From Swiss-Prot:
Region (Dimerization/Multimerization of capsid protein p24): 280-366
Catalytic activity line of the entry: Endopeptidase for which the P1 residue is preferably hydrophobic; Endohydrolysis of RNA in RNA/DNA hybrids. Three different cleavage modes: 1. sequence-specific internal cleavage of RNA. Human immunodeficiency virus type 1 and Moloney murine leukemia virus enzymes prefer to cleave the RNA strand one nucleotide away from the RNA-DNA junction. 2. RNA 5'-end directed cleavage 13-19 nucleotides from the RNA end. 3. DNA 3'-end directed cleavage 15-20 nucleotides away from the primer terminus; 3'-end directed exonucleolytic cleavage of viral RNA-DNA hybrid; DNA(n) + a 2'-deoxyribonucleoside 5'-triphosphate = DNA(n+1) + diphosphate
Annotated source species: Human immunodeficiency virus type 2 subtype A (isolate Ghana-1) (HIV-2)
Annotated gene: gag-pol
Listed Basic and acidic residues bias regions: 477-492
Activity regulation: Protease: The viral protease is inhibited by many synthetic protease inhibitors (PIs), such as amprenavir, atazanavir, indinavir, loprinavir, nelfinavir, ritonavir and saquinavir. Use of protease inhibitors in tritherapy regimens permit more ambitious therapeutic strategies. Reverse transcriptase/ribonuclease H: RT can be inhibited either by nucleoside RT inhibitors (NRTIs) or by non nucleoside RT inhibitors (NNRTIs).
Name the record gives this protein: Gag-Pol polyprotein
Binding site for Zn(2+): 1183, 1187, 1211, 1214
ZnF (CCHC-type) ranges: 390-407, 411-428
Length: 1464
């Protein structure tokens, strides 16, 4: 304090208190300002004692001078204070701060001999010679530059700043001041001084790495440089990691192309510091709002504290102060602030708002409210006889207009007080039409229905109310059970408040008052002195006139004028009128009027007003993915023509409210460009939203496919309309708009680019389809409920309406839909409105009784590319839905393999023939028909050449649609398997389009199908069907028998191949002593096995037994293929067709064929009989009791598979049907599938562990959510379960099951019924469980007991699959293995990041480092190179590996201790 007290003494201190802070202000300097300035000097490494003299102040000003233009408010205040102290020391008389600054400027300018002003905006990085100031780089007299290290005072000031402010807003300008002119070496020295705050330092490092990478990408390395030439800096050079101080100085001050590496590096650090400031000060300036009762001064303090953390230009901060400070104030203060006029000073705002919210203001408000309440209400139309009182819109006072007002002009709208529009365009001044009573906060956004009195307020009594708009909402109310009328809530959904509530009770939720649309006259029925009259509600008429009624002789003659001229009327007063369930007494005239009208005198008495509800669709909140930021991509160059086109498009969109100008604080940008539309006359604007799509949250497509005309029910009338600018009618959430910013550049950079952001859904953004689909579903939902007899098909912006109504009624419902859409802000362009057939819709042409494809045009090319073929195939696939016989197999083969889109394609003869055949098919026009629910749906399948299939789905003789199938999933296949795939495709397609399965006509005999299906059934969904007699086109070609053929020769085959030389051998031996070997070249193991099998077929008789050890060969043969892409398999097929009977079996790797010993000694029939005869009988008893499978018998009794298979096959209850073909399912250890099945009138709930096949099942009393939840809880208490997959039955989707799953931590997923990829495992297990129950049913009385017995058999008596284990063994083994893996990983992770230095024997030198494998109590195990050593703990030093930067001794390990400087 001594130095601070000695700064100014006596007379100087008195003079200080006479100097004003501002020229026009009243506040003056005090000694507290000197104390504050002394504290601030320490941040810049300057001594407080410098303030005691004129020369010291001059030194301070020299340091602060270059920082003023970009400094904070604190820095500028410090500079001003030092200027005042300098003037006092120089005995210069000044009145205020501004005079002091000007005086200091003149004196210091004269001393330095320059005209440089004090607060200069820019200065060179290195000063001229002789003016070194505080710069680390200084110029010598010879013109060279030398480096002066940073002083300890500067580093200390930096560290103290970080410690005091904890990365507050002051850190960034402080860093700018202290690092002025520094090299990267000096900046790194400053960063290294910060010991704590390592999280912030890591953020800065990541920013440096990112910026360095961007620098390297934008500045590629040039070619070889001449000798002696200085290289250009890389990103790591700028960061100071790969460059020296001398190189940095040369880059900064070289004459040719200098690179300011210091300033660049400072900018990188500033970006990192700004990110840290935002992290440590998370409050956004936009979120700082004044509380309802918060004093204005406290709000201003919070505002400016947050404003300091915003690192933006001074102009932007000034804009924030002028707009946000007032905009975010509470309503009371905002009202006061707007009365201060344009751009009030902060002092004026603080003074004006000083008493706002206090008792005084509340008393004034209450007095005004009481005064208004005591004022009698005006008599209707009495004001028309008096002079109207003029009220000023600007100041609110009476007696003058806004033009004559002398008060400061209010900023923004004079109606609502908001900026951005004038009062004439204020949305709050808009009105809806004829609303009964006063409005709430939100106007109803949809047309209303009939009034509560029963009269249709929207139509004349003679017209049917069934077609009125009110029907939409009447039906919606009945569906929801509501009693009131539908209104639009703020969140965009529809609610139905109770009709019984009064207007005053509804408050801000809006009123369900009578509403009249303007597409026809608002005519109602009124009762005038009990006489019913139809009258027109006319807000443009002053008086009310009716004709044709008698109201007595007490009248006054009157002549009134109107559009048709003057008419004579009789004016009668005090007439009772009942209209819209309200009674009033008013004056009415009778006379010869062309139409009865109620004018404003009656409408006012009824409380009606003219309103225009502004339809608002609430935007859906959208966010970025966690941890992601918006796109910051530069705009690429565009041609002048495209720039002008984009400017015109953007100006039009801005006028229509679809775009708005982006503020200067928006840091995001996405490139934009333009392309010509199809007509080549207009341009289309495109935005490259790929980066924004990558960081935006994920969405779910609500509409998963395109509607098909064959699925439409047959209707008499069809209308198609289009929603114009569909995406641009849906608002984008305000918080997300900033990320859609884009820039329109100018030619030659003649002006700054104009930046826009989207206010609506942008084209090309991934969220637009999902949000649009969701919004349209909500908008159309009440219309669908109100018109259940009308078909409404909506796909994106195309809408189809079909009905059996009369022409007038159909047109009326279409008009209602258009009005509904128009009322919500959607446009329905007349040019795309289609009423008369043919109607163009989704690529189809529609008539009331049939549909066609729009005209197809196959491309004609001289030279075909891959892209051309793709387009051609796409057109043909589109045509295949109605043109039968379309083929594309050979066309697709033209582009098979890896080819570029522009690569030229060479046509084959087959492809040319296929194309010509398709052209002939397309030349004959085809028609499709609509679906009739009462008729049966049929599907007929036909096989074409080359395994291409055609099918048609029809009702009687009328074809709904056709299709083709040519996808061959296996290299070796047969017609029956392909037929099953075709049936499956048709079944899925029919479920999607019609919701039902057709009756199939299959070109196969029942016996052929059942023979293949019994031996090759699949765990996939195949719909049920009835066989219809058709010409059999599909048949199996060779006879595989299930049992060995007695008396036939038995062949044992094998093949092998050397992987390096690709040489192999195929061989066989027989039980009769024959053998054969064939040497193969350039082959594989699988090909050698097939060659051996083919040799066997060639050399064997008409009946043969073949034993193979290859599952590959076995799988091909038992699939009974009819054709294949493999030469050797086609040869096998041809040879097997010639055989009378073939028995094929598989045994695992009989080594005798491999050359070790003769195969006939290993697998001869005699050995099999002698070795296992005594074990066959116990195996048969075991099977009769438990019905164990073949693998279990083989494992438990050691009998051969052939014997075990025979035991199972001879059992009447266990007829084998082959092995299942399993698809790919999630087989993690915690995944279970659950389903309910029915047997003997009981409900059985089944749960299957997917990976092991372990089953849990029991009988439950009812298929409810509670019983399912109890079973799930019981299951989870026994076994680990993390994922449960079920179908979407009501019991599985119930709240009880969801609550149990949430409590246990189970992830739930649901599949679609009949989908083969959904719950195939549990569906198959239901089948197995029922079969097992049928085998042992007689062993128990109740179904509850037999279910548990069957579960025991399936879990413990059924062996096979992976590891040849039972499901119970497999599940326990999986759980044990998982625990062991976790234990080992946990142990290994303890040693993963440690290295060991060690000593061996008497050698005192430390060796290593080695990798730590294990740490025991007395020794450690170390891996050194390929050797593993055991080292005593006392001779080992364990060190954590920190990537070569830091080391920790073993004291950081648990149980470590130090002895004599060594780690034990």
């Amino acid at each position: 304090m001594g130095a601070r007290n000695s700064v100014l003494r006596g007379k100087k201190a008195d003079e200080l208190e006479k100097i004003r802070l501002r020229p026009s202000g009243k506040k003056k300097y005090r000694l507290k300002h000197i104390v504050w300035a002394a504290n601030e000097l320490d941040k810049f490494g300057l001594a407080e004692s410098l303030l005691e003299s004129k020369e010291g102040c001059q030194k301070i000003l020299t340091v602060l001078d270059p920082l003023v233009p970009t400094g904070s408010e604190n820095l500028k205040s410090l500079f001003n204070t030092v200027c005042v102290i300098w003037c006092l020391h120089a005995e210069e008389k000044v009145k205020d701060t501004e005079e002091a600054k000007k005086l200091v400027q003149r004196h210091l300018g004269a001393e330095t001999g320059t005209a440089e002003k004090m607060p200069s905006t820019s200065r060179p990085t290195a000063p001229p010679s002789g003016r070194g100031r505080n710069f680390p780089v200084q110029q010598t007299g010879g013109g060279n530059y030398i480096h002066v290290p940073l002083s300890p005072r500067t580093l200390n000031a930096w560290v103290k700043l970080v410690e005091d402010k904890k990365f507050g807003a002051e850190v960034v300008p402080g860093f700018q001041a202290l690092s002025e002119g520094c090299t990267p070496y000096d900046i790194n020295q400053m960063l290294n001084c910060v010991g704590d705050h390592q999280a912030a330092m890591q953020i800065i490092r990541e920013i440096i790495n990112d910026e360095a990478a961007d620098w390297d990408a934008q500045h590629p390395i040039p070619g070889p440089l001449p000798a002696g030439q200085l290289r250009d800096p890389r990103g790591s050079d700028i960061a100071g990691t790969t460059s020296t101080v001398e190189e940095q100085i040369q880059w900064m001050y070289r004459p040719q192309n200098p690179v300011p590496v210091g300033n660049i590096y400072r900018r990188w650090i500033q970006i990192g510091l700004q990110k840290c400031v935002r992290m440590y000060n998370p409050t956004n300036i936009l979120d700082v709002k004044q509380g309802p009762k918060e004093p204005f001064q406290s709000y201003v303090d919070r505002f400016y504290k947050s404003l300091r953390a915003e690192q933006t230009d001074p102009a932007v901060k000034n804009w924030m102060t002028q707009t946000l400070l007032i905009q975010n104030a509470n309503p009371d203060c905002k009202l006061v602030l707007k009365g201060l006029g344009m751009n009030p000073t902060l002092e004026e705002m603080l003074t004006a708002c000083q008493g706002v919210g206090g008792p005084g203001q509340k008393a004034r408000l209450m007095a005004e409210a009481l005064k208004e309440a005591l004022t009698p209400p005006p008599i209707p139309f009495a004001a028309a006889q008096q002079r109207k009182v003029i009220r000023c819109w600007n100041c609110g006072k009476e007696g003058h207009s806004a033009r004559q007002c002398r008060a400061p002009r209010r900023q923004g709208c004079w109606k609502c007080g908001k900026t951005g529009h004038v009062m004439a365009k204020c949305p709050e001044r808009q009105a809806g039409f004829l609303r009964d009573g006063s409005m709430g906060k939100e106007a109803p956004q949809l047309p209303r229905g009939p009034s509560s009195s029963g009269a249709d307020t929207n139509s004349t009594p003679s017209r049917s109310s069934s077609g009125s708009i009110g029907k939409i909402y009447a039906a919606g109310e009945r569906a929801e059970g509501a009693e009131g009328e539908t209104i639009q809530r703020g969140d965009g959904r529809l609610t139905a408040p109770r009709a019984g509530k009064s207007t005053s009770q509804r408050g801000d939720r809006g009123l369900a008052a009578p509403q009249f649309s303007l597409w026809k006259r608002p005519v109602v029925t009124a009762y005038i002195e009990v006489q019913p009259v139809e009258v027109l509600l006319d807000t443009g008429a002053d008086d009310s006139i009716v004709a044709g009624i008698q109201l007595g002789d007490n009248y006054v003659p009157k002549i009134v004028g109107g559009i048709g001229g003057f008419i004579n009327t009789k004016e009668i007063k005090n007439i009772e009128i009942k209209v819209l369930n309200k009674r009033v007494r008013a004056t009415i005239m009778t006379g010869d009027t062309p139409i009865n009208i109620f004018g404003r005198n009656i409408l006012t008495a009824l409380g009606m007003s003219l309103n225009l509800p502004i339809a608002k669709i609430e935007p859906i909140k959208v966010t970025l993915k966690p941890g992601k930021d918006g796109p910051r991509l530069r705009q690429w160059p565009l041609t002048k023509e495209k720039i002008e086109a984009l400017r015109e498009i953007c100006e039009k969109m801005e006028k229509e409210g679809q775009l708005e100008e982006a503020p200067p604080t928006n840091p995001y940008n996405t490139p934009t460009f333009a392309i010509k539309k199809k007509d080549k006359n207009k341009w289309r604007m495109l935005i490259d939203f790929r980066e924004l799509n990558r960081v935006t949250q994920d969405f779910t497509e609500i509409q998963l496919g395109i509607p098909h005309p064959a699925g439409l029910a047959k209707k008499k009338r069809i209308t198609v309309l289009d929603v114009g600018d569909a995406y641009f009618s849906i608002p984008l959430h305000e918080d997300f708009r900033q990320y859609t910013a884009f820039t329109l550049p100018s030619v030659n950079n003649a002006e700054p680019g104009k930046r826009y952001i989207y206010k609506v859904l942008p084209q090309g953004w991934k969220g637009s389809p999902a949000i649009f689909q969701h919004t349209m579903r909500q908008v159309l939902e009440p219309f669908r409920k109100a018109n259940p007899d009308v078909i409404l098909i909506q796909y994106m912006d195309d809408i189809l309406i079909a009905s059996d109504r009369t022409g007038l009624e159909h047109d009326k419902v279409v008009l209602q839909l258009k009005e509904l859409l128009n009322g919500l802000g959607f446009s329905t362009p007349d040019e795309k409105f289609q009423k008369d057939p043919p109607l163009q819709w989704m690529g189809y042409e529609l008539w009331p009784t049939k549909w066609k494809l729009q005209k197809l045009q196959l491309p004609q090319k001289e030279i075909w590319t891959v892209n051309d073929i793709q387009k051609l195939v796409g057109v043909l696939n589109w045509a295949a839905q109605i043109y039968p016989g379309i083929k594309t197999k050979h066309l697709c083969r033209l582009i098979k393999g890896k080819m570029t889109l522009t690569e030229e394609v060479q046509w084959t003869e087959l492809a040319e023939a296929e194309l010509e055949e398709n052209k002939i098919i397309l030349s004959q026009e085809q028609e499709g028909y609509y679906y009739q629910e009462e008729k049966e749906l049929e599907a007929t399948i036909q096989k074409n050449q080359d395994n291409q299939w055609t099918y048609k789905i029809h009702q009687e003789e009328k074809i709904l649609k056709v299709g083709k199938y040519a996808k061959i999933k296996n290299t070796h296949t047969n017609g029956v398997r392909l037929l099953a795939q075709v049936v499956q495709k048709i079944g899925k397609e029919a479920l999607v389009i019609w919701g039902r399965i057709p009756k199939f006509h299959l070109p196969v005999e029942r016996e052929t199908w059942e023979q293949w299906w019994d031996n090759y059934w699949q765990v996939t969904w195949i719909p049920e069907w009835d066989f219809v007699s058709t010409p059999p086109l599909v048949r199996l070609t060779f006879n595989l028998v299930g049992d060995p053929i007695p008396g036939a020769e038995t062949f044992y085959t094998d093949g092998s191949c050397n992987r390096q030389s690709k040489e192999g051998k195929a061989r066989y031996v027989t039980d009769r002593g024959r053998d054969k070997v064939r040497v193969l070249e350039r082959t594989t193991n699988q090909q050698a096995e097939l060659e051996a099998f083919a040799m066997t077929l060639t050399d064997s008789g008409p009946k043969v037994n073949i034993i193979v050890d290859s599952q590959y060969v076995m799988g091909i043969v038992v699939g009974q293929p009819t054709e294949s892409e493999s030469r050797i398999v086609n040869q096998i097929i041809e040879d097997m067709i010639k055989k009378e009977a073939v028995y094929v079996a598989w045994v695992p790797a009989h080594k005798g064929i491999g050359g070790n010993q003769e195969v006939d000694h290993l697998v001869s029939q005699g050995i099999r009989q002698v070795l296992f005869l005594e074990r066959i009988e116990p195996a048969q008893e075991e099977h009769e009791k438990y019905h164990s499978n073949m693998k279990e018998l083989t494992h438990k009794f050691g009998i051969p598979q052939l014997v075990a298979r025979q035991i199972v096959n001879t059992c009447a209850q266990c007829q084998q049907k082959g092995e299942a073909i399993h698809g790919q399912v999630n087989a993690e250890i915690g995944v279970w599938q659950m389903d309910c099945t029915h047997l003997e009138g009981k409900i059985i709930i089944v749960a299957v562990h997917v990976a092991s096949g372990f089953i849990e099942a029991e009988v439950i009393p009812q298929e409810s959510g509670r019983q399912t939840a109890l079973f799930l809880l019981k299951l989870a208490s026994r076994w680990p379960i993390t994922h449960l997959h079920t179908d979407n039955g009501s019991n599985f989707t119930s709240q009880e099951v969801k609550m149990v799953a949430w409590w246990i931590g189970i992830e739930q997923s649901f599949g679609v019924p009949y989908n083969p990829q959904s719950q195939g495992v549990v569906e198959a297990m239901n089948h197995h469980l029922k079969n097992q129950i049928s085998r042992i049913r007689e062993q128990a009385n109740t179904i509850e007991t037999i279910v548990l017995m069957a579960v025991h058999c399936m879990n413990f008596k059924r062996r096979g699959g992976i590891g040849d284990m039972t499901p119970a063994e497999r599940l326990i083994n999986m759980i044990t293995t998982e625990q062991e893996i976790q234990f080992l990983q946990r142990k290994n992770s303890n040693f993963k990041n440690f290295q060991v230095y060690y000593r061996e024997g008497r050698d005192q030198l430390w060796k290593g480092p080695g990798e730590l494998l294990w740490k025991g109590d007395g020794a450690v195990i170390v891996k050194v190179g390929a050797d593993i050593k055991v080292i005593p703990r006392r001779k080992a030093k364990i060190i954590r590996d920190y990537g070569g930067r830091q080391e920790l001794d073993s004291s950081h390990l648990e149980g470590a201790r130090e002895e004599d400087g060594e780690v034990a």
